[in-house]
Structure formats: structure tokens, C-alpha cells
Amino acid sequence: MEWGDRGPTEMQDAAAGTHMTDDATPQDTPPVGTDMTTVLYPESQASEMTSAADKAVRKRDGRSAEWEPERIVRAIALAFYAARNKGADNPHRDNSTKHYGLSFLDHADVLRIAGMVINTVELRASRGVKPSVEEIQDIVEMMIAGAGHFDVAKAYVLYRAKKSEARIAKHGVSGISDYIAMSKYARYREDLGRRELWPEAAKRVFEMHRSRFASLLQKEVFGMDRTLGQMIDTAEAAVRDRQALPSMRSMQFGGDAIEVNNARMYNCTFGHIDHVRKFSQALWLLLSGTGVGFSVQKQHVTRLAPFPLRASAEDLPVKHFTIPDTIEGWADAMQELVMSYYEGTYVEFDFSEIRAKGAVLRTSGGRAPGHQPLKKALEKIRGVLDAIPGRKMRPIEAYDILMLAASAVISGGIRRSATIALFSADDEEMVNAKTGEWWKHNAQRQHSNNSAMLVRSDATKEEFMSLFNAIRQFGEPGFYFTENADYGANPCVEIGLAPSLVVDETTRAKLEQYGYGESVSVGDTISGWQHCNLTTINGRMCETPEKFYELCAVAATIGTMQAAYTEMSYLGPVTRVINERESLLGVSICGILERPDVLLDPAVLRKGAETCVMTNRAVAEAIGIEPAARVTCVKPEGTASLLLGTASGIHPHHAKRYFRRVQAARTEPVYNFFKSWNPQMTEVYGMKADTTDVITFPVEAPEGAILKKDINALQFLDMVKLVQENWVVPGTAHEKYNPGLRHNVSNTVTVRENEWESVADFIWENRAYFTGVSLLAASGDKDYQQAPNEEVTTPSDIVKWNGLTYTPVDYSLMSEAADYTSLKETVACAGGACEIL
């Protein structure tokens, strides 16, 4: 076995004993004074003469160099000097006649230790093994520790780390952006026999927009000195170059799938569970790939009609329902089940029309889940409904029904669903929904984040602290600050949403135009769903304010076009009116802390927000929709950050250099193709060794970026506040319908043990600038194996880092006979979960 092998050789067993702890005490070293050659080679202590060729050393680049024992003496001597002089500069570092600045006794120790190292190296060389530089350094470190000079050994370890840092590889493109694009968003092209490449995906999306606005492409956009067609061309080029991103749902579904179902354009939505139709509509939205926020506050759920008393199942008239093989069919099955408890019938479902598991979904892409996920969900929902007859539904029951519906989507639908449940702060059942051993009896509750509503003008600090302490202890429930209990948010809480309206004459006319069939009077309040429409600016590209403003205009242009897709007949006319009257945008910035000199400048942020608002107003006029009420936000950007090669949203890079790990099933075609080009970047995932591997990508933060270690929790929250004040608030164009409602800066705060109290005080005192805050206790990234993010710190980390040289993958050569895309793997609006892929 060669010295460079990683197996448990005698050399590595001995070298493992030299690992330094913080106080420089070696672990499991032989007794002080032991001649270490007797540990390594007990059969011989004598140096055996070998030829010069045999004693050549393997350098780091693989070349051979002459064996020079005096370099060993010098390296050990410099470590002694550093330990004795607390790291001071050594004026004699190159002067052997001055013993490298050491005393006679220390120099004698140096020669003795060097002799043992030389003997050991030459013994290995005599056996035909050519040692590497790192292996010789391991021996030096071990011999110093074995001689009892622990302070010198630590100095030598630090010296090695410093030299390794100077030699660390500079990786260019790591491959993560293209891998994520191909594995998570690329559509299968049957005509090409492969998945589309990123430029082809961008073209597909913008051809959809050109088709929709075909009659307007030559129209000059007021104030822009360009036609709409030219602005679309500019936007496509920016997306192709990854300077900006559209809605990632549009990248996933753009084309026929969105034209058939406009809900697929939108990342997320929010609604009140105040009408029996909301259950089936929520399922339809989840099946469309939309993240769903919902309110089960008491004032909303109480609007559901009470359930009549119910006879036993065998005494009820049976109603048969054959479930159509569409997302509308699945949602209708939910509606039939809930309504059967109002109508006094027992519904039996026929699943025979649902395609078999694995069948190709030609419009939306991916593969059919089969009928089992829906069947299981409906039976469990029936169990919840069986307990209700004779009274009104409780919020916890409405919540569980929706979570069981979400589990059907997660098990086999288009994508993993993302949900947030907002509830009344005094609802003890919802407060305690995830306490005790809830996962044993109510595992469906894992599919949501839960937050209590705190109206800013009414909430007390005691209420807030009760929730804050629950987050610290259990992780949930969270808190949600609002101006009005009828407002809400998407699952990541960066979009302010108001899914109800007060009817006026204009609204009533619109409702009639869109076919609203119910009687409604001026002054009535009715509810539906409000959607959020997101785009992203690549912060790393914003080297100057001017470039930032340019990308603001691009992102606002894309978002405004996306806001025109409002036909969702399954949700009804109320939802369409709600969405069209405010035509929301969510222009986000990904990688704010990559360019803090630009993107934390209040004046630059304000001008950028104004650019977004003005561009939206101009493009909206050109395409005939309302200008947006709210335009700017900051979303978590978990997956987008990987596509763009930036830190996520407003969050800092994990470190200057770190490993970013992405899980991949061994059956995934894209993963296997990537591995064939870059096997050195893949390894078995220890938690799922039978089925899953991980890819380790090397990530390096740009010069000038703010890193995780550079800021504490309060400094980070202050940055969130600054961006909210100067980017989000100026991006609020009007408050005509929903006073005080704002978009937000989605953020996750890492809190050290001594920071919790000050963080609570800061959030409470500045609650006008915060809506929801995710709180995570600080922990080390080496606390468990194969962490999603791991800083490069140790010499072995550097060796691994230097070995992660990426060979660019030509995905155009990846051939697939059929569509094996797995769009359910893509998560939108999933908060912290975005970091774990």
C-alpha cells in the first residue's frame, strides 16, 4: 500500500495519534522520549542506504524532487523557534550556522528528532515507496509530539495550515449551477432525445411570453425608448446569462403547462379557510406546483357551516364518484368527500381512471404518482371528518385535513409541497400542534411551518416572548407580525398577501364579467386566493449601482409579464379579481452580501426600488394590466442561489471557502451523467447509504463578501431592517386596497447561546420592520458528517478541496430514451428547507 493511500496502514494508525486538541495535547501518543522509528518499524532502527532515485520525494503536483534531509532539520527548527518566541519573526530562519536562532539544547533536540524522521523516510524509500511531501510532514508532526514537545507540535500544525492556505486551489466554475439547472428544472425534449440546456429553457419561457403578447411586441413602452419586444429580448439575454431569473415555476412549467393552468406560473399563494371550497382549491394549488399559505384563525374557520349529525356509514345512501385523471379530478374528490358530510351521503371512490404509477405526464413533465397517495389521503381525511358531525369544525381539524392533502402531493405529485399555517395566538390546540410525540400520531403535520398571528397594535411582549421561547426550545410555532389579522403570507413570508376584498360597484361588475354566480352586494367581504409572482436579481453581478439598476428593470419587466397570467377557472372569479387589481410582483435580490458596498447602500437600494416601480408601471400600461401594488422583496433564494452561484438571499456565505453538498439518488440520470465526468466529486451518503450519494461542490465567496463569521445575530438583523426600509418599503407602489401591508425580507438568523435575549429585544423593538423571522441555534458544521455546508479549515479539508477540480460537463451529450425528469424534487417557498437538496 502506498503512503498516499487512505487505508488503515501502520503509518496512518501512528499518525492518527498526533491530532492536536485546542490545548495542543496529542491524543494517544507513545510515551515521551520514545524513538518513533521503533513504533513505525520495530524490526530496524538503522538508516539503510538507498540510491538517490529511491530517495526522491513526490511533490504535490506529482513530480519528483531530490531528497534533502537538511530541509527537515530547518522545518523542525523553525517550529521550535515559533513555539519559544510566540510566533515572532525569526531573523535567522535561513542561517544554519546560527542554529536557526535556537539555543544549543533546543538545536540538539531538533537534530535528534530530525534524525528519527530521516531514518523513517529512508526506511520507506528502501522498500520502494516514494514518500509525498504531506506524508513526510505527517511523520515530522508525529516525531515532535512523540518527543514530548507538544507546544512545538502545535506550532508545526499551524505552520502547515498556513502554508496549505497559501497553496489552496482556486476553483473557477464548480459545476453546481449547471447540475441544478439540469436536475431540477430542465424539461425533456423528445425531439432531441435529451433534456434542454439552460439557454434552451430560457428560450422556451420567453417564447411563451412573445406568443402571449404577440400583437404588442412592436409597441413602444412609455418612458423606456424601446419596444416591448426589445425589452423581452433584453430580459431573455439576462436570464440566459444568469444575471436574473424569472419565476422558477415558469422555468419548470413554461409553455403548454402554464397556458393550460396559469397557477403554474406562481411560486406561492395565500387564502383563508373560510369556505368549504377552500379545501379542494388548496389541493388543486398544491398539485399545480404552488406553495400554499393558509389561515386557520378562529375568525376564518368559524365561517364554515356546522356539520349536521350523521348516521352510521352503513345507514347512509351511497354516492359513487369516479375520479378523473387530472389535477381537477383529484381536487374534486376532496370536494366530494367534504360535501358528503354536509349532504348526509357516503361517497365511494373509483380510482380506475387514474394512470398507473410511472406513466409519463406529457404536459407538465415528470411521471404519474399512481392512485395510492390520493387514496390514502382521502381515507385519513375521512377519519378526521368522522369526528365532526353535530358541531363546527375546529381550526386544528381544518389544519389536519389540509396537511393530509399535502401528504398526497408529497408522496407522488409534481413537487414536494410547501405550506404555512397561520393561526390565532390564543388557539392552544394549534400552539401545541407539534409538541409531545406528535410525529407518531400526526405525521402529516411535518408538511407545514406554523406561526401565530400577532397584530402589531394589539400584541403584548408577553405573547411574543411566549412564542419566541417556544421557537428556542422546540423550533415552532413561529410568530407573524401583521397590521391586520386578515393579511397573510406565502410559506417563506417574503410576500404580503390579502386574499379578500370589499365589494364596490367596479368589483361587482368585474365579478359578473368573469361569471360569478352568487348574489353579492356592495360592502360585502368575499375571499379567494392571492398569488405571489417572483423574479430574482443576481447580486454578484451588481458590481456597480448602474448594473444593479439595469437588472432591476429586467426583473421588473419579467415580473410584470408574469402578472398577466391570471386565468385559473378552478379558483373562480373572486381570485381572479383579487390578483388582477393588485397584480403583485416580488422582485428579489439574491446574494446581497456578495456586494455589500452596493447592495447595503440605502440610496442605491431606494433608487433600485424606484426603478422597479417605474418599469412595472410602464410595462403594465403596455400590456394592459394594473400596475403592481407591491413590487420588491427578498426571498430565501435557496435553489436560485445555486443556479446563480451566490449566497442565498440576504444571508452571508457560509465561509470564505466551503464544501456545498447536494444529495442525489443513484437512479437519477443527471447524477449518473455528472458522475461519469467527475467521479472525484461524488461519494456515498452515509445516512442513506443504500440509495443515495452526495456531490461535493467547492464554493468560494468573492472578495469583499460578508461571511457568516463576520457578523453576529444583531448585526444581521440590522441589515435585514436596512433592506426592508430602503428596498421593500420604497417598492410599495400604493396601499389603496390593503393599508399597511408590505412585502418582506425573508431571513433566517443564526443565534449563538449568549444572543437569544438581545435578539428577542431587537425583534420586538423593531417589529414594524419584521413580519416573520426564522431562528436557528448556532452549531458547528463539523458536528455531523457530510453537512450541507462545511468550512474548509483543516489540512485534510484543503487536500480534499484541491482534489475537487471540476471537469466541465457537456450535458448536450446526455441521451435519454424517455422522460425521466423528476419535478417533484424542486421546492418553492420552503424556507430553510431550500438549503437541503
Residue ranges and their predicted role:
Residues E2-L837:
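Extended catalytic cores of very large enzyme megasubunits
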